[in-house]
Every structure is written in C-alpha cells, then in structure tokens.
Amino acid sequence: MAGKMKLFSVTSERPLATKIADYLDIPLCEVELQKFSDGEVKINIEESIRGTNAYVVQSMNSNVNERLMELLIMVDALKRASVHSINIIMPYYGYARQDRKARSREPITAKLMANLIQRAGADRLITVDLHAAQIQGFFNIPIDHLSAIPLIGDYLIENYGEKDVVVVAPDHSGVVRARRIADRLNAPIAILNRKPRPHEDEIMSVIGDVKGKVAIVVDDIIDTGVRATTSADILLEKGAVEVIACATHSVMAGNATERLQNSNIKEVITSDSIDLPEDKQFDKLTTISIGRILGRAIEGVQENRSLHPLF
C-alpha cells in the first residue's frame, strides 16, 4: 500500500491505541479535540498527513452516539487533509445487536452505522468479534473481522487446561463461538436453552453434561451482567463445580461490575476492546489485550499481506 503509516486515537481507546503504537514502534499522531458548550465537537490534526495511510482507533463504548459522531468528524478531517487512505480500527462495533428487524417497524441500525462510516469517507474497517458476522455484508468497503477467541483460548489452556471442563454456549446462536474455544481445549460443549423473549432471561434447560465440570461460558458481549450471572446459577444448580465467564467485549453497563463481583462466577475473562475506567474494574476481572493482533492487522494492511492467521 502506498503512503506512510499514521496512527490516531480520537477519545475512546487511548490505552489500546498506545499498545498498538508500541507494537508498531510508531508515535500516536497529535489530535486536538474541542468540545463546545452545546456539545459540538471540533477536531484539528496537529501535523501534515498528506498522502499517508491513516489508521484511526475508536471503539463505540460508553456513549456510543458521541463516539460515533467523533469518528465521523475525524474521518472528514482526514479526508480534507488529503490522506491516501482512511482505515478505521473499531474493536467494538456499536449497534451490532440491531442487525435485523426482530419486530415490525424496527430499524436496522447496524446497517445505518455502516452507511454513515462509508459515506463519511472510510476506506476500510478492522473490527473484532462482531455480534453477528453477517454485519460484514452491510459494507461495500473491505472489512477485516478479527477475533480475540484465540487469545482467550490460550489463557484458558494455561489456567484451566488440566481441569475437566465443558464449554457452554449461552444460547443456540453462540454455538459456533463456543465450538472454537472447545476445539482449542479439546473439551465438550453444552448449550443453554433460553426462552427468546425481550427483556427476560429465562433458561428452560441445559443441553449437555456439566455435572462435576468447570463450566466455561463463552459470549461476545457482557453488558449488564444478568445473562452471565443467570447462566452461572443454572450451571451450578445442574452440578458444575465452577463457572468461568468469557466475552470479548465488556460493556459493563449500570451496576454490572457489582453484580458480577457478587455472583457465583469465579472469574470473568475479557479483552481491552473497550477501555474500562477504574470504577468499572473488579477483583474477578481478567483483561487480555488485543493490541498485538490489531497491530499485526495494521502491518498486514500496510504491507499488503494476508490477515488470515488473525481471523
């Protein structure tokens, strides 16, 4: 790819962007972001970037609407600064759970997100463990859909590989994700048969044997923590000796951290796709960095190499 590499962080993922910069051995470019009294945002890039390949790190965490607007303004600033290409590094893709019309007269906001990012001028999106892989089809630009599952799998092998484990999909749609972890651990899988009702979390049955085993529940997102804690309760009721909760993205909305810390879950394993503030940290939480795989992805894009090993 023609053009020198330039790495930017807008607001949401400065710690992760710093890890990526350290891996690539390049500095983060200076960006001045002003917020006016009415909430408007203004961005100024503090150096010449004409003809470069811009890589912008921005997750859709905390206030997703504000993060999205910052990103769109940043993309516009880069385009008007005559960069060669604009590559978005969005570890956590916001609105991913609104990927279809579940009921009549509902929007498909994940598609709207794709439209906005493309119309603003982005040339590529690099993301991690989309809630629904088919969201890739909402884009007409290249998407590199990476996964934190291998990193989480390696951690589980190191810490639970000698134990009798079962990998649990929290619902039927999570079986593929659970299977990837189970294959790495050479372990069986179980499935929680949930009743698909909005605003309810009722588990009707457990499909598979969990008795006497360490149950590892694998999900893509931990939001309020209710789904993880109810999963743990039913698995322990069915005879599991311990429950470990894993998810790539830790939203930790509301009192999720308190709920998880006080739950029957032994350990919560997640990535740094979302930067959690100090008040969202808790003793049971283990965070695995995805900075290296994102850095390798940027290297691959920059040097026109295959990213297949990162998927």
UniProtKB/Swiss-Prot annotation:
Its EC number is 2.7.6.1. It is found in: Cytoplasm. It catalyses: D-ribose 5-phosphate + ATP = 5-phospho-alpha-D-ribose 1-diphosphate + AMP + H(+). ATP binds at residues 38-40, 97-98. InterPro entries: PRib_PP_synth_CS, Pribosyltran_N, PRibTrfase_dom, PRTase-like, Rib-P_diPkinase, Rib-P_diPkinase_bac. Pathway: Metabolic intermediate biosynthesis; 5-phospho-alpha-D-ribose 1-diphosphate biosynthesis; 5-phospho-alpha-D-ribose 1-diphosphate from D-ribose 5-phosphate (route I): step 1/1. Binds 2 Mg(2+) ions per subunit. Mg(2+) 1 binds at residue 131. This is Putative ribose-phosphate pyrophosphokinase 2.
